[in-house]
Structures are given as structure tokens and as C-alpha cells.
Amino acid sequence: WGIPVFIDQKRKVIQHPVVGFLLSLLEIIGSGYRDSAVMQLIKSGFLGLAEEEQDALENYVQQFKIRGTLWKKPFSRMGDNYTAEDLNRFNELREQVVSVIETARDRIGKYNTAGEKIKGLYGFLADDFMMEDRIEAMAKSQQEAGFLDGAAETAQSWNVICRIFDQIVETVGEERLSGRALRQIVEAGLAEMEIGIVPVNPDSVLVGTMQR
């Protein structure tokens, strides 16, 4: 009948791409440019790289074993598979990725307490990275593609993250934390959070249970 169907249920926010972006960013800041964390950051969908660019960059860094501080140095190896044009593009993407990470590091690294670090992190996300705008764009794209539940979840993700930040500031704001410990406490908080989805399309048919 062409009527959108919306499944009424709560979802764990820890599984959302915006959380993947946030946790991988904090892992890199706290523990260095680990392969898995860097690729999770890139593939979160928030850095503006097209899927083919993500895949091509992943293949390049795997082939030439780019890890750790090598991300901060210009790529120079081409082998038999890449041209100078490819290399230039990979370096543009590398600079894009590293700029995000190092800007966030500058915002957070100069502080010692949990509260200060969270405020620095929020400043990066809200002011430097414009995360709320990026989230709105993702939600709009999901809605236009017909992924109504995903769009509704995305639309709420920023507020959920801000609530966790507020809780951390209120409960352990005065405690000194390393970058690694900050990631752990943010992850622990987000792991407990659920999103109760509200349909973004008013014409959706709601399918739920007696418990809701």
C-alpha cells in the first residue's frame, strides 16, 4: 500500500555510527593511530569521504603498512598499483583525517580533569567539527532513502551524547583522567543508553508491543 511501517522499539545507542566516530576518535587520542581505530573513524561516515575513497585509502594503508605516526607524514610509496595522481589524492585524504584528529587532540590534551576534557571535547564537536549539522545531514539522507527508523535514531544521537557528557562532568568532573581513561568512561556511559525512537514521518504506521 506504500505506507511506511515503523517498528516501535528501543535501540542501544552504542551501535550508532556517531558513537563509533566518537569512540574511535578518543581511542586514537588516548592510544595512538591504531589501524582499527583509524579505519573505524574513516568509515563512520562523518569525515566526508565517499565509500570508494574509504576503500581505496584502506587498501593503500594496508598494502604499505601505514600505522602510528606514519599517518602524520606524507605518503610517498606507489608501488606498481598507484599513480602520482592516486598518491596526491591519498595525501589529501590523509591530511583530512589527521586534521580532525589533531584538532580534537589540541582541544582535549591540554586539560587534566574529566570535566575539562569533556568541555574541550564538546567544543571540538560542536564548534570545530559542527557535529550537530553533520548528524542532521545524515538523518535527512537516511529519511530520503526510506530508512525512517535509522533517521529517527540519528536525529536523537547528539542529545544522547550531550547527556552523557553532562553526567560525566557532574559525577567525576574534578577527577584527573588520562585520554585512555576518558574513552573508557565515555564508552561505559554510552553502553547503557537507549534511544526510544519516534517516527520522523507522521504518516508512518506504528508497530509496537503491549509493553510500549
Residues covered by each model-derived region:
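Polyanion-engaging groove/track-forming segments
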Residues: 1-212
